[in-house]
């Protein structure tokens, strides 16, 4: 090295000494301390004990669930056994507490009874129909609102097929009924814009056979509203309280199916003038009238429910029923005059095969006081006389004989209805 001019020693002396140091990794190869191992083991044992306890609890809950299912099935069978026997229909009056109540039976007696634990307490409302056990009178079931009620609503296929065109004459009566019943149901906004309340009820009165019920049938045919028809005598029941309950059922059914029309025929059966009743039957009829007045006063104008009443004894009705606010419009159906007779004869005979010699004007001009039902009876009787002789044409002699037959039956005027 010296030969080539490189001095090694000097270079080595000049290079500083390098020191190599190991990096600090922080890893310990000696393992955890003994204290840490003891903590982990104790925690493991504790979790293992908790798992065993939860497994025991799971088994206990499964066994308890099986027992509860058995009890539930047994309770269901017991309820079915109780409900399988004939039950008594009653009326829920008042709840004493969660387990007992006061109910009324059809015999008029009230009972303090127990309530089956499976019954939904929200269904127990005053005057609700309930089923009572035959022997203990315990309340075992709640019947739907429409059960135990003789009030039925006419469906679309049960409505009468009588149209306004089938009713001869009575143009004024038709217009008044349609204004009071149909128009408020179809165009309520007209009354609201004018600022008046539509009529709540309509009373149709007049002698028998003048078309009151027939016009009500035409209203039922033409309207799309629900139509409920009852007769006044239906409210008079054997047991106390049944009549007022039926009145409530009628108006409840109408409100639930609004818009609706309630037609009460022969209203004089329950709405005669009140007096100092001496018998229980008279007092019950008066209670029915009071319930009817209460229901009509409770009408909400926003509920589209209209009431039509018909009678041939308007003079016997109670003044409280006739006052404005209950029956706002009173429509009279008098015996037909000459013009009305002509229209009724023309309407009824339009479908009949009459001979050319039949002069209807002759029968119209006769002074006999006859109703529309009498005219219909004359036409029907003349047709029956033609059938008796195997003819397809009704002759004038058939009409004459039929007229004498019908009028002879009604020779005496109806002084009762004047």
Swiss-Prot record:
Record's keyword terms, sorted: Acetylation, ATP-binding, Cytoplasm, Nucleotide-binding, Nucleus, Phosphoprotein, Proteasome
Sequence positions bearing N6-acetyllysine: 397, 401
GO molecular function term, any single one: ATP binding
Name of a matching Pfam family: AAA
GO terms classed as biological process: blastocyst development; proteasome-mediated ubiquitin-dependent protein catabolic process
Phosphoserine modification, residue list: 21, 28
Entry-linked SUPFAM superfamilies: P-loop containing nucleoside triphosphate hydrolases
Acyltransferase found in the keyword field: no
Modified residues (N-acetylmethionine): 1
Residue positions, PTM Phosphothreonine: 25
Record's subcellular location: Cytoplasm; Nucleus
Stored InterPro entries: 26S_Proteasome_ATPase, AAA+_ATPase, AAA_lid_3, ATPase_AAA_core, ATPase_AAA_CS, NA-bd_OB-fold, P-loop_NTPase, Prot_ATP_ID_OB_2nd
Major subcellular site: cytoplasm
Protein origin, superkingdom: Eukaryota
PROSITE patterns: AAA
A GO CC term assigned to this protein in UniProt: inclusion body
Binding site for ATP: 206-213
Quaternary structure and partners: Component of the 19S proteasome regulatory particle complex. The 26S proteasome consists of a 20S core particle (CP) and two 19S regulatory subunits (RP). The regulatory particle is made of a lid composed of 9 subunits, a base containing 6 ATPases including PSMC4 and few additional components. Interacts with NR1I3. Interacts with PAAF1. Interacts with TRIM5. Interacts with ZFAND1.
Family classification: Belongs to the AAA ATPase family.
Cited function: Component of the 26S proteasome, a multiprotein complex involved in the ATP-dependent degradation of ubiquitinated proteins. This complex plays a key role in the maintenance of protein homeostasis by removing misfolded or damaged proteins, which could impair cellular functions, and by removing proteins whose functions are no longer required. Therefore, the proteasome participates in numerous cellular processes, including cell cycle progression, apoptosis, or DNA damage repair.
Name of the protein in its database record: 26S proteasome regulatory subunit 6B
